[in-house]
Curated annotation (Swiss-Prot):
The gene is COX23. The lineage of its organism: Eukaryota, Fungi, Dikarya, Ascomycota, Saccharomycotina. Residues 1-26 are annotated as: Disordered. It is found in: Mitochondrion intermembrane space. Belongs to the COX23 family. This is Cytochrome c oxidase-assembly factor COX23, mitochondrial. PROSITE patterns: CHCH (PS51808). Residues 61-103 form the CHCH domain.
Length: 111
């Protein structure tokens, strides 16, 4: 149990994220297409709010870290050609935008 708590504290594990590619439903039926996200992170989740509140003041926390990792992986695979990875950068930017808007709307839950 302590190992699981350390993983969650470090921000490397989200129990709601499906990591098995065979179980991911890329086009779920009945989902409103206006609310579709092009990034795997959920910056407004309760877990991210908790992690952000529990971090030290001098510590940096990025709720869009999965999108950031994907951007770096794309750069590595494409010989650091930024044009090839534009979609990944856009996805990260949208994730950060959603997170900052959520923090501005509800400052009490994002201490």
């Amino acid at each position: 149990m302590a190992a699981d708590e350390d993983i969650i504290k470090d921000g490397n594990y989200d129990p709601h994220v499906q990591t098995d590619k065979d179980k991911v439903d890329y086009a779920p039926k009945g989902v409103d297409t206006t609310e579709y996200r092009y990034y795997p992170d959920n910056p407004e989740s309760t877990l991210n709010k908790y992690r952000f509140a529990m971090k030290d003041h001098s510590q940096y926390y990025d709720p869009c870290q999965e999108s950031a990792k994907m951007s770096f992986k794309c750069l590595e695979l494409n010989d650091y050609d930024r044009d090839q990875c534009k979609e990944y950068f856009d996805a990260y930017r949208e994730c950060k935008k959603q997170w900052l808007e959520a923090r501005r709307k509800d400052r009490t839950n994002w201490s």
